[in-house]
Regions:
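FabD-like malonyl-/acyl-CoA
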Residues: 2-145
Length: 145
């Protein structure tokens, strides 16, 4: 019997674990962006985040010195470079984690229904823990917004 992995997660005990700062997130984001539907969703979420931050955009610009384009970093698996700076890595890792959750949802995995026995995050991985908890509370990734 050949059972799709995410189908098994929907019915078997499992844990979700999310990595943090050392994650080569630009590479993961580039991989996710190769899927046109996922790329559109990620750009939509990034734009929504920018809209929420608009009231403090001048302060953010004063801190970073320039706008941060999360999709503009080189996808290098060996070196993060400028993508390691907190002004890029915090939103970049969060967006990439959201991308993983969106991709899993498109493949039929819903943590609200699958009920993982644990959701763990190391360092910035805790952001995805909060995303997963929001999905569980809302019932689906779509309802969580």
């Amino acid at each position: 019997m050949n059972t799709f992995f995410l189908d098994r997660l929907n019915s078997e005990p499992h844990a979700l674990a999310f990595a943090g700062q050392s994650t080569p997130w630009p590479l993961a984001l580039a991989d996710q962006s190769a899927n046109p539907a996922l790329d559109e969703a990620l750009h939509t979420h990034a734009a929504a985040a920018q809209a929420l931050l608009y009231p403090v955009s001048a302060e953010l610009l004063a801190t970073t010195g320039r706008p941060v384009d999360l999709f503009g970093f080189e996808p290098n698996p060996a070196r993060l470079g400028a993508a390691a700076a907190a002004s890029a890595s915090v939103p970049g890792i969060a967006l990439t984690q959201l991308g993983a959750l969106l991709d899993a949802a498109a493949l039929g995995y819903n943590p609200a229904q699958a009920k993982p026995v644990a959701v763990l995050g190391h360092s910035q991985g805790v952001l995805a823990v909060h995303m997963t908890r929001a999905i569980e509370a809302a019932g689906s990734i779509e309802a969580a917004g």
